[in-house]
Amino acid sequence: WLMIVEQKCRVIVMLAKCFEAGKKKCQKYWPDSKETKAFGRVTVFNAEEVKYCGFIRRRFRIESVDKVLSMEVFQYQYINWPDHSVPNTTSNLVRMHKYVIQCLEETGSDAPMVV
């Protein structure tokens, strides 16, 4: 989260699930819905989770412990990518991509997107 804050990133894109076929694929680095978790000098509040067909959009509220910094970050997690394969169709991935582009435009930020 420190990198997100330092670079003022507003959008995170994730193309994997945390677990597939009972195996851990990546670390869950965010709190559960409506929960807050501290990560060093920042706290992350998972303000919203919206499930779409094939992906999840999360809206995080990030604050520094001294309350000097406050920012909103969106995470898009594609959940239909099969382990060791490719999706049967790209329609959900293309739809998520459109949402990501729209979100980048709405934030007005020129900060890098984290993938």
From Swiss-Prot:
Belongs to the protein-tyrosine phosphatase family. It comes from Styela plicata (Wrinkled sea squirt). GO terms for molecular function: protein tyrosine phosphatase activity. Residues 1-115 form the Tyrosine-protein phosphatase domain. PROSITE patterns: TYR_PHOSPHATASE_PTP. It comes from the Eukaryota. InterPro entries: Prot-tyrosine_phosphatase-like, Protein-Tyr_Phosphatase, PTP_cat. The gene is STY-18. The keyword Hydrolase applies. Keywords: Hydrolase, Protein phosphatase. Its EC number is 3.1.3.48. It catalyses: O-phospho-L-tyrosyl-[protein] + H2O = L-tyrosyl-[protein] + phosphate. This is Tyrosine-protein phosphatase 18. Substrate binds at D83.
